[in-house]
Every structure is written in structure tokens, then in C-alpha cells.
Amino acid sequence: MGNQTTVAETTNTIAGSQTFADVDLRPICENMTNSEFRAVFATAQVTAVEKLGARITALQRWSQDERNRVSKWFGRNDETTRMRLLTGLTKVLAVVRGFNEHNVVRSGSAGDLATGCTPHPRGTENEAAHVCAPDTATHTIAISARFCTMRPWTDGADSHVSTIIHEATHFHDTMSSTDDKYTITPFLAPWGRSNPDLAINNADSIAGYVVDGDD
């Protein structure tokens, strides 16, 4: 059974009877222990919280620099766009702060499957993580293999930090974001300027806007 073990439990209903349960002992990341993973995730989580907080503050102040930043990623900087980001990122921040050992799980684990969403038809080989958008009760984030070998942080490409933000935007009680354009690259912001109606709802555009550059 690989990295699973069979555990016998004595019941309290019939003398001497036992039930058997398979306990999944596989780590979240194959290249590190769960303790090491928790430390890696916590470090990225702290940075994500800091970056989200910085953007929320900047959106509240609404300086010309922030207006330019919003235009760079979303092709417009009107009040509707500002409020979409301000309201949404405030909710995203709360979810990111709430990620913990109970709702950060391995992709394909019982905790992942319990969210009720069916597996992605393309599989998980090319994804870093996924969530079940309607899962507003637990906000579970499932970690896939790509996350385990990603860079911890960078301001111009996918990373642990951008992945955490990206996934948190998908929940229906945050921003109900979409995946019209994947991957943070130098081409993502120009795509957003050409497709503002899509970009304002695109998870990687939102994450790219949050992590872009130094504050």
C-alpha cells in the first residue's frame, strides 16, 4: 500500500471485534518532511500577508503611483476597479491569514477530496495548488508537487507567495477569480491592459499585481 499503513482499532460494541482503517502517511511534499513543509509554507504566508496588506493600504491612499500600478495590470484605474481590488483583497487577506495545518493539505488527500469538487480533468501535474471555490466553510488549499520545487519568492514570476495569493482569490467569498490567463510572466501585464474585463477577474493577474516590485 506504499506509504499507507493499516491500523486496527478495537470497537466498543462487540467484544474482540476490530475495524481497519487506512491511514495515509505520505507527506505533502515528497522532497521534505511535513514539518519542513509547514515552515516553508509559513514563511511564504507571512510574505503574502505583508504584500496584501501593502496593496490594501495603497489602494486606500490611491496615490498616482498606485493608479499607475493598477493601470499596468488591469488596463484601467477607475473607481470600480479600485473598489473591486480593495474589497476583494481585504477578503483574500483574511483567508490567507487563516491557512493552517488543518486546511493546507496534500493534493488528492482525504482533506482535498472532502471539499466536494471533482478533480481537474487535466490532472495536477502542472499545477502548484488548487482550491474548491465553493468551499467557503474550510478554505482548504491542496498542495501539488510543483509547489514543492518552486522558488519561495520573486516579484516577477510564479512562487510560493504568488500561489498562495492566487488560490485564495478563487473562493466565492473572496473574489471568485478565474484562470483565463495562467502564469506570472512579463507578458501578463500587457495581456491585462489589452483585456481589462478578463484581467480584473484573473487570478494570476491579481496575484501579479500584488507581488509586483518593491513597495
What feature does the model see in each segment?
Residues 1-161, 171-215:
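Predominantly extracellular/secreted Zn2+-dependent metalloproteases
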Residues 167:
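Walker B catalytic acidic pair
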